[in-house]
Amino acid sequence: MAAPGGRGRSLSGLLPAQTSLEYALLDAVTQQEKDSLVYQYLQKVDGWEQDLSVPEFPEGLEWLNTEEPISVYKDLCGKIVVLDFFTYCCINCIHLLPDLHALEHTYSDKDGLLIIGVHSAKFPNEKVLDNIKSAVLRYNITHPMVNDADASLWQELEVSCWPTLVILGPRGNMLFSLIGEGHKDKLFLYTSIALKYYKDRGQIRDNKIGIKLYKDSLPPSPLLFPGKVTVDQVTDRLVIADTGHHRILVVWKNGQIQYSIGGPNPGRKDGIFSESTFNSPQGVAIMNNIIYVADTENHLIRKIDLEAEKVSTVAGIGIQGTDKEGGAKGEQQPISSPWDVVFGTSGSEVQRGDILWIAMAGTHQIWALLLDSGKLPKKNELTKGTCLRFAGSGNEENRNNAYPHKAGFAQPSGLSLASEDPWSCLFVADSESSTVRTVSLKDGAVKHLVGGERDPMNLFAFGDVDGVGINAKLQHPLGVTWDKKRNLLYVADSYNHKIKVVDPKTKNCTTLAGTGDTNNVTSSSFTESTFNEPGGLCIGENGELLYVADTNNHQIKVMDLETKMVSVLPIFRSENAVVDGPFLVEKQKTLPKLPKSAPSIRLSPVTACAGQTLQFKLRLDLPSGSKLTEGVSSCWFLTAEGNEWLLQGQIAAGDIENISSQPTISLQIPDDCLSLEAIVSVSVFLYYCSADSSACMMKAILFSQPLQITDTQQGCIAPVELRYVF
């Protein structure tokens, strides 16, 4: 197919015909009617004398997840292509990703469909390829992506907002556009009928596109894009949202892990720690051995009980909500992308902790979850478990107002509480307006503190300027924390790669640490140390230390507010890890030789497809009264002799610390399968003592799981229970 001779035309050329189609679809009742209408529409636009042709990708653009740059009129010939115009800071763009993931799992390039992300930056920081690489990893983007830093394609097509999807036919001809989020049904309808229409005409090709996933180059690290961190003021433990590993860590102040809950893969499951899963958790708050978690991409608030070692859901239904008022009981109340949480109080008692304040980034609001019956300002008595909007209209704005429901936020992403007078407020890092705002705990009034612009609709007033009030400029701040000792507010000025400090009395905002460079430097001087998109921070050690989630450096940085030194908190397990610089390197567990007496159990074959996760649940019973030997690590190993590619990048060994709470072993089938048959083995070695400790012994067992891999989409795979009584 030859490239069109003329310049590509804008999306406005599609508007009349597609608008008529969408009005007709409103009146369609059956799926057959809808399919027919879309088919007729394609006949119409395909018959136009001149295609609405997309321009070629400009030369010299930076590509990710591909072996080489992609050409519209060479590589994409014979494909239905979905162009996703997005920017990685945008919550609406993030909301769209699950729809694209679902589409990728339904149709592959062999079926004739390809998705290409066209990154068109809002903030200057988002034009930098390294920062986009971090976003690709953080959001598990596996389709090809191009960094259109100058927004050339955006301007050629006259795209107007993020996100926008443009669906192309096999000649690079524009067929449909979808603006904003929430169009999953239309996306699937349009792409499925387009594939059928052009297959009927023999114009779809099944050639594969050269994919090379950037995530395969990621080095091992104890943390992966940690989003938030908080301190248990009673024990000085830290709670870390290890966002990229989809888990919550509870660590002692020396960095030793006490609990690891969830991970390494995303999921949505309550229960005991070894079985519970999260999906890109962000905000965390801890009090009395209870942790509340903003489970962002699950659209849930989760509760972790450290004493019972269980996880439960207290708000949200597991899918993105659109309700902007709320008022239902937590588990029945849909919510949208909660990004941070902080404890508050409904009465005059300071720090009673009967309210959980929520930065609801997805609906641009501040919500409240009642942990006990109580009252909010200007509200009647509310029952325990009620989850509702407190401030924000739901419009994406930088609007301050004495009436909380008339105020507007723009993706609030960080919260901190100053309950004492004269402050008595929530501090809010309002990321998309590049401001810090306050919400009064007495009447809900929303006020400006620093950053941004007076025009409530101007969300482009960002920069890196120390100053007072509106003269100070921030760039997409994601975190705030209140220093009660000094009456100062610390701000994670994320896209400026700095930590700033604000005096709320004078509204003076100055740089505390960071140079603005994204190098990973620790120093005896705050001003010489560097950060890379820090996402969260908290005060610890009675106001002496500031802990920073240095997100893109995959670290927790420790800032000593007295000595002005910056260091890295090592994250390690007590005996099974050593620290080598910023990365944790697990001591390589060596698979012991199985004793001849060890039973070998061959399981029934399991069928799975690429991308699915197979779970093995250990269910081993010791003789009555026996207990695991203290000081000796009972352990498990995952092997795949002759098919080691199955285990690449997976956790292939681990400890068994408690016989009453045995781990679940996860194996995700890689997207690129080198064989359709394999045998996966689980070897278990248990060291235990009899009830009276008169005899201690080691027992082992081998489970062999035949695996058949298919390219046909499978339903949910039931966990495989590995049972044996010793």
From Swiss-Prot:
Organism classification: Eukaryota, Metazoa, Chordata, Craniata, Vertebrata
Subcellular location: Cytoplasm, Cytosol
Protein name listed in UniProt: NHL repeat-containing protein 2
Effect annotated for changing residue 148 to Y: In FINCA; uncertain significance; decreases protein stability
Cellular component annotations (GO), alphabetically ordered: cytosol; extracellular region; platelet alpha granule lumen
Tissue distribution: Ubiquitous. Detected in heart, kidney, muscle, brain, lung, liver and in skin fibroblasts (at protein level).
Top-level taxon: Eukaryota
Predominant subcellular localization, coarse grouping: cytoplasm
Thioredoxin domain sequence ranges: 43-200
